[in-house]
Every structure is written in C-alpha cells, then in structure tokens.
C-alpha cells in the first residue's frame, strides 16, 4: 500500500508504495483511509526536532488525524460494521490501570499514540482497536471528521469550564486556538480575545468571531505586553480580568501575561506544550484563587460526543480548512503548514 513514512533520521518525510497492509486481530478493524489532516505533531516529526529524535522510531508510518471506511473487522467486533464511515481516537490505552478502569482513559499512564509509537494514518489502510473507532454521523463530512483529533483537543480545553457569559482569553492562534474561538462563540462567551504573532491566523480568528485578535509581535517585554492587553480590555469595556483562560501556545510570556490579566477566581485550561521549563508568578495563582487544569488529548469518548453534537447543532468548523490537496502533493502540504499561512491542510487519499 501507499504510505508516508519517516524513513531517515533527518528532516523530511517520504512516500513509499510497497508498505504491507497491516494485519488486524480479533478485536480490531481495518480502515481504508479517505482523508487525513496534517497536525503540528506531524510537522515536528517532519522537521526532526529534539522531541522527535527522542520519541519517534525509524522507520515509522506517521499521521493520526483521519477519516475512512471500515473494510474488514475481527470476529470479536460488534460495535461497527463493514462500510461504516469512521474516525478514531489516536491515543491507545491499556484498559487495566486505575484511571482506565474508572472511566478516565485519557489519563492512562501507559498511553501510546498512532503515528507516534505505532503505525499511523498516513497510509491507505490503518488497523485500530474497535474500542477506539468512532462512527461519523451522516451529516458530518469526511474533511471535518479528519480534524476530529485537534477539534477534540479544542473542545476538551474550552469546555473544561463554563464559557457562557464569560470573558475568555486565548493565547495561541494555531488551528486548535482558532477552533477554540469558534467553540467559545458558539457557547455564548461574552468577549473573546486571542493573541498570536501570525497575522494570517489572527485574521482568521477575527472572521471566526473573536472580539479582538491581538498581534503581540511588536511588544519587546512583558511589561509592554501586559500594558497593551490592559488597554485592549479597557477598549472593549472590561473593568475586571478574564474569567476563563485557554492557553494554547506553551510560550512563557503568554502564560505570564495570562496570569496577570485573569480575574480573581479565574479558571485556566492549559494545552500548549512548552519547549522547556516555564517560570510563573506563583503569587498570582494563590492570591487570585486561580484554578488551573492541564489538558492532554480528549476525554474518551465524552469529548467526541460533545463535538459531534455541537457540529450537528450548527457549529460551523468548515472555515478552519484552508487547503485541500491530493496525497501526491503531500510535500506542498507540509510546506504550507511550515509557512503558517493556513488553517488545517487536508490530504485526499482517493485514487
């Protein structure tokens, strides 16, 4: 089968045409891939950064955001049928630890990821345990379903706390941050402010309903950044701090600024992964009585039910997809992702 694989311990990704179709077991399904989306993680693997060098076995078929069709299944599978349109949870868990047995599978200590630790979805076929497979409702397109993984991250982060009637600050306007703007607006947030240094994506955020999309590139230090944020708050009628913070960047200055402008009793969801250690004002957390929640992946499968229900209720995520390419143009897709001048990039695996 055709697949995209990390074949060398250097930057790049390579097309192969003779990868074996994976074998499925008693409780597995075989999925024919229709669409995949390129994730920031895939870009890290492409660039072969320090995290990738320490994590990714080579050779490895990568990718974990997908939509496809069930074409075969093991004898023990009763939850899906051949012909079902599906996506799937890319975190594979042990099912036996305390958290798994308590229904908190997203907190499994033994989690491994498709396209990271085991064969991924950048291939014509993918094998996955049936318990990880999620049926796609007829009203949701394959393109949108292929973005369920990052959308689930955005849903989990944004809906960890109530957003209705609240003032929300989002730091980081990557695709997940942009999805969070859509989610917060759909859920009735009062004011939504988002920060980034990428003007293309900040304009997308404005189009998605952000009250203010602030380019923080011009500000030379933390004091200037906080001063400008307080001016923004004043300009939009905020007399107190933000009620909810959604941290999507992993950038020290963004987190420090967020802590500075949160209201007393504010709540923060932290999804962004830092490249190194982060220094925070512990006093701001204590004396403001802030609540912090770390986010990893999606709740299985509450997050999936929430996002499909919201999409079916009218939340429009289609504009997050800015580029659609055939799989043979995968190099162009990765170059577009590297440029940052995009939302989600979808790869079509049809013949």
From Swiss-Prot:
What pathway or pathways are given for this protein in its record? Amino-acid degradation; L-threonine degradation via oxydo-reductase pathway; glycine from L-threonine: step 1/2
Tell me where it resides.
Answer: Cytoplasm
* Residue sites binding Zn(2+) 2 per the record: 94, 97, 100, 108
Record keywords: Metal-binding included? yes
Matching entries from SUPFAM superfamilies are given as:
GroES-like, NAD(P)-binding Rossmann-fold domains
- For the protein in the UniProt heading, the enzyme class is oxidoreductase
Question: What's a single GO BP term from this record?
Answer: L-threonine catabolic process to glycine
- What EC number(s) does its UniProt record assign? 1.1.1.103
**Record site feature (Important for catalytic activity for the proton relay mechanism but does not participate directly in the coordination of zinc atom), residues:** 149
Positions annotated to bind Zn(2+) 1: 39, 64-65
Q: PANTHER family from the entry?
A: L-THREONINE 3-DEHYDROGENASE
Q: Which family does it belong to?
A: Belongs to the zinc-containing alcohol dehydrogenase family.
Role this protein plays: Catalyzes the NAD(+)-dependent oxidation of L-threonine to 2-amino-3-ketobutyrate.
Q: How does it assemble?
A: Homotetramer.
Q: What is this protein called?
A: L-threonine 3-dehydrogenase
Native organism is: Francisella tularensis subsp. holarctica (strain LVS)
């Amino acid at each position: 089968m055709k697949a995209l694989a990390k074949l060398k311990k250097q930057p790049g990704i390579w097309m192969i045409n003779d990868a074996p179709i994976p074998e499925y077991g008693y409780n597995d399904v075989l999925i024919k891939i229709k669409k995949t989306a390129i994730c920031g993680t895939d870009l890290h693997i492409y660039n072969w950064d320090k995290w990738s060098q320490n994590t990714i076995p080579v050779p490895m078929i990568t990718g974990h955001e997908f939509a496809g069709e069930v074409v075969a299944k093991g004898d023990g599978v009763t939850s899906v049928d051949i012909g079902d349109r599906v996506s799937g949870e890319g975190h594979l868990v042990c099912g036996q630890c305390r958290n798994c047995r308590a229904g908190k599978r997203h907190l499994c200590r033994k989690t491994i990821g498709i396209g990271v630790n085991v064969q991924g979805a950048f291939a014509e076929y993918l094998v996955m345990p049936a318990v990880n497979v999620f049926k796609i409702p007829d009203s949701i397109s394959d393109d949108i379903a292929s973005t369920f993984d990052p959308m689930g991250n955005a849903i989990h982060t944004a809906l960890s706390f109530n957003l209705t009637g609240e003032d929300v600050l989002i730091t980081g306007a990557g695709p997940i941050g942009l999805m969070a703007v859509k989610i917060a607006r759909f859920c009735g947030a009062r004011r939504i402010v988002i920060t980034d240094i990428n003007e293309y994506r900040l304009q997308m955020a404005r189009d998605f309903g952000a009250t203010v999309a602030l380019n923080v590139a011009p500000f030379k230090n933390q004091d200037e950044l906080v001063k400008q944020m307080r001016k923004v708050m004043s300009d939009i009628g905020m007399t107190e701090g933000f009620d909810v913070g959604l941290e999507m960047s992993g950038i020290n200055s963004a987190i420090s600024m967020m802590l500075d402008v949160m209201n007393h009793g504010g709540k923060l969801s932290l999804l962004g992964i830092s490249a190194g250690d982060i220094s925070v004002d512990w006093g701001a957390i204590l004396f403001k009585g802030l609540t912090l929640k770390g986010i990893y992946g999606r709740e299985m499968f509450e997050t999936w039910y929430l996002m499909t229900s919201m999409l079916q209720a009218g939340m429009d995520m289609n504009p997050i997809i800015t580029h659609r390419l055939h799989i043979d143009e995968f190099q162009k897709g990765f170059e577009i992702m590297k440029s940052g001048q995009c939302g989600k990039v979808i790869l079509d695996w049809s013949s």
